[in-house]
Amino acid sequence: MNKMEQMKQQLREEIVVAVKAAGLATDETIPEVILETPKEKAHGDFATNMAMQLARVAKKAPRLIAEELTAKLDRKRAAIEKIEIAGPGFINFFLDNSYLREMIPTVLRAESAYGETNVGKGKKVQVEFVSANPTGNLHLGHARGAAVGDALCNILAKAGYDVSREYYINDAGNQINNLALSLEARYFQALGMEKDMPEDGYHGEDIIQFGKDLAETHGDKFVHESSEERLAFFREYGLKRELEKIKSDLEEFRVPFDNWYSETSLYTTGKVEKTLNVLKEKGKTYEQDGALWFRSTEYGDDKDRVLVKNDGSYTYLTPDISYHEDKFLRGFEKLINIWGADHHGYIPRMKAAIQALGYEKDQLDVQIIQMVSLFQNGEKVKMSKRTGKAVTLRDLMEEVGIDATRYFFAMRSADSHLDFDMDLAVSKSNENPVYYVQYAHARVCSMLRKGKELGLSFDESTDLSPIASEKEYDLLKKIGEFPEVVAEAAQKQMPHRITNYVHELASTLHSFYNAEQVINPENDEQSKARLALMKATQVTLKNALSLVGVEAPERM
């Protein structure tokens, strides 16, 4: 628990003591103490509606309750300098800022661990994201899903969850047959032979190149093989090459995975059949018109779903149910899926499926990644200038850069449409949010270098009493919020809460820098204290940026 959290907890405890001392409630009737951080600085550091909550129990007007409560509050123990009662009975608390100085040694000691909390308590969580079909390049939706998914994993881990990152490889569907047929056509064409592309073929440049590579390496070897043998090889070859490309792009984008899970393995290990048997034994299926149906309407779905078609083949839903059962059988207590915008209607049937298998519907959360629109020179970008094709993750990394792409994708709520201004993302101005926050970090590093050159050293035991200005306290309060922001972002699964925070921290730093002199040639003690504050700011900025996969440059 960091200093700000300690102060908050101490205040909660002192409010409970004051409520009981004023005779307003007992242990049995006292409500939970809710402390919020007001949006307006004039309303204090913390505020509570406790007086309104107690009105029914105490049978008094909230303002009167607020007066009686605050009269009994031990301000010194609660580290409170001033209290104001506002409106119908809100109680606004203003901290004794001198206590905030203790935040600095806490951050300096923690370094990269600053911001860690234990709200997750080691709970096993699996996040499955990207999971693009291995049949082409990663597009904008996949790129946004990768940025959001990785940031969420980082945040969950920082908040004390045991996180596993998984990519589900769709390698068993008809799309892999189409990949093999497309590769076959490109292979024949590379040999100068005529071969039509399949109706649902893949026309990407990558497939053309794979065909050329095969022709160059193997010559006409596969022409003389049976179609069955040839397509079996092309399936395996095409899948391997596509996955290599996807893995390479994601690795460059700083998105690691702990596990790559093959859909095919669900069939080869008999897991799909086992899951079907479980559903049958539980009475969750029935036969109709030669097909096997899942009673998903029992769990709120708008209609029952087919699991096995009348020709004996499985629907897409069947292996997906088996896959989710397997996740639980691997010991995960919570599943988070990050899906594209076109999967919204799929959520009720998956929640129905896990309930039918005996799990709680809240054990599965699904984040929907909304569409991305690119803009350049004020106009919507539909095609890449480099390839003339749809814009890919690789195009964005090359044209905009990894940091800007990661930050912009994490900057808005995942379920809201994102307009991505490519000109803004590469501009070196304060209007560019990623430049603004990275420049804040570089600026702090510059101050720290200057202090070192002047021999102004500091450590955890440095005298911090010279820190006394309003701007310094504003910065300390903002630094102190970080662990709570991490906890909130994890619990609400909101990576954009981190980008909002880091922008606020950068803004608070710039405000301090414009108002105060960090290094005062006439006051070494003040300079050392302020440099310690700068180091705490630098650590917090870097830690926050790392959560969304963005680097913190020391020079710009």
Curated annotation (Swiss-Prot):
Pfam families the record matches: Arg_tRNA_synt_N, DALR_1, tRNA-synt_1d
CDD domains cross-referenced by the UniProt entry: Anticodon_Ia_Arg, ArgRS_core
GO biological process: arginyl-tRNA aminoacylation
Keywords: Aminoacyl-tRNA synthetase, ATP-binding, Cytoplasm, Ligase, Nucleotide-binding, Protein biosynthesis
Motif interval(s): 'HIGH' region: 132-142
EC assignment: 6.1.1.19
SMART domains named among the record's database cross-references: Arg_tRNA_synt_N, DALR_1
Main location: cytoplasm
Similarity comment: family membership: Belongs to the class-I aminoacyl-tRNA synthetase family.
Alphabetized HAMAP family for the sequence: Arg_tRNA_synth
Identification of the protein by name: Arginine--tRNA ligase 1
The species this protein was found in: Halalkalibacterium halodurans (strain ATCC BAA-125 / DSM 18197 / FERM 7344 / JCM 9153 / C-125)
Gene: argS1
